[in-house]
């Protein structure tokens, strides 16, 4: 397979780790990155180490996902430094701009794929970003790590536009949905009928809210009594109060995660047969529970069983989000170069059911 160059929109926690993990992947070269204050572009390849050093504890963003601001590219409030000097512009490779996404789009003729490491604090935010690339006649791959079920339908509504542009869009390509729906799709192959898919995840974030503001804010939207709108409007003290109220450990049940619709569109099972929950510990690196996928079904010879897949507790959220996302990116580029355009979920890139 030919070399692949790609861009990252957003240099918060996920975006920075995407750049770092890519340095361990053969055939992948990051050539552009941006956040709300600036952009870095080098078609020969970014100096990832320099960018990571420059943006450590220095992430631009406001955490509220103000998508009416054309500069918005990440979901994390300024972690340890505020102002226009935060984020990518602190890098020697960075250039200040009021329109960072437009700057990436302007370079997109020479970019194979774009990974959207962005917040989803408005349901239509990611779909609107996809539209902007399509309107610019971008031909290539878009990858996101979104979690919200209803967003998949919004992307499907735009599929014709994406196909006309020549875009292959893989949605939900992180840990959950991405890695875990892929595992569920494989586990389902033992059965002729899948009755139930249970996904239970555990994440430890010793670096806490300050270094993971966008992720934590999005997760709070899944708690009972909250939704994406209320989470978006909460100020920093309110977010911290929720964390304190739960002693730093948030438990989620029956989450609106995209795993359900992605498994349904792949023909594995009905969306209503998928349940997702988990525990987030914002004060410890250790996972509070083992991430587990359980697929229950009936085999061709009438046996009922459950296939179980677990992630080792030693693997971090960053490893389980960014490794799969870049893997799906590689697969999507193959499809795109073969002329296969449209919207795909991770399970659709696995063996068919």
Swiss-Prot record:
One of its GO terms (biological process) is biotin biosynthetic process. NAD(+) binds at residues 10-14, 214-215. HAMAP family: BioU (MF_00852). Belongs to the BioU family. This is (S)-8-amino-7-oxononanoate synthase BioU. It comes from Haloferax mediterranei (strain ATCC 33500 / DSM 1411 / JCM 8866 / NBRC 14739 / NCIMB 2177 / R-4). A 'suicide' enzyme that participates in biotin synthesis. Catalyzes the formation of (S)-8-amino-7-oxononanoate (DAN-carbamic acid) from (7R,8S)-8-amino-7-(carboxyamino)nonanoate (DAN), a function equivalent to the cannonical BioA reaction and the first half-reaction of BioD. The cellular requirement for biotin is thought be low enough that this single turnover enzyme supplies a sufficient amount of the cofactor. In cannonical biotin synthesis a pimeloyl-conjugate is transformed into biotin by the subsequent action of BioF, BioA, BioD and BioB. This enzyme replaces BioA and performs the first half-reaction of BioD. The gene is bioU. Its EC number is 2.6.1.121. Coiled coil: none annotated.
């Amino acid at each position: 397979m030919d070399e692949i160059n790609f861009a990252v929109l957003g240099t918060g926690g996920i975006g920075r780790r995407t750049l770092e993990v890519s340095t361990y992947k053969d055939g992948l070269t990051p050539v552009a990155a941006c956040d709300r204050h600036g952009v870095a572009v080098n078609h020969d390849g970014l100096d990832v180490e320099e960018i990571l050093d420059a943006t450590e504890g220095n992430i631009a963003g406001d955490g509220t996902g103000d998508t009416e601001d054309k500069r918005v590219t990440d979901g994390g409030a300024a972690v340890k430094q505020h102002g226009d000097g935060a984020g990518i512009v602190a890098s020697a490779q960075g250039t200040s701009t009021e329109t960072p996404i437009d700057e990436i789009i302007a370079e997109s003729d020479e970019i194979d794929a774009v990974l959207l490491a962005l917040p989803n604090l408005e349901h239509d935010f990611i779909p609107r970003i996809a539209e902007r690339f399509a309107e610019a006649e971008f031909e290539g791959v878009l990858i996101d790590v979104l979690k919200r079920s209803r967003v998949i339908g919004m992307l499907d509504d735009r599929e014709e536009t994406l196909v006309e542009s020549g875009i292959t869009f893989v949605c939900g390509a992180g840990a959950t949905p991405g890695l875990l729906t892929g595992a569920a799709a494989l586990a389902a192959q033992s059965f002729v009928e899948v009755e139930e898919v249970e996904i239970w995840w555990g994440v430890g974030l010793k670096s806490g809210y300050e270094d993971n503001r966008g992720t934590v804010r999005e997760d709070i939207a899944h708690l009972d009594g909250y939704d994406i709108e209320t989470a978006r409007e909460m100020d920093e003290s309110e977010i911290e109060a929720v964390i304190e109220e739960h002693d730093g450990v948030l438990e989620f049940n029956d989450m609106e995660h995209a795993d359900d619709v992605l498994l349904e569109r792949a023909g594995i099972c009905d969306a209503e047969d998928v349940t997702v929950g988990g525990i987030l510990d914002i004060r410890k690196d250790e996972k509070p529970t083992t991430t587990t996928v359980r697929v229950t079904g009936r085999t061709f010879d009438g046996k009922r069983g459950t296939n179980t897949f677990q992630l080792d507790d030693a693997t971090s959220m960053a490893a389980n989000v960014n490794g799969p996302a870049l893997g799906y990116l590689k697969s999507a580029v193959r499809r795109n170069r073969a002329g296969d355009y449209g919207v795909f979920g991770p399970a659709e890139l696995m063996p068919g059911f």
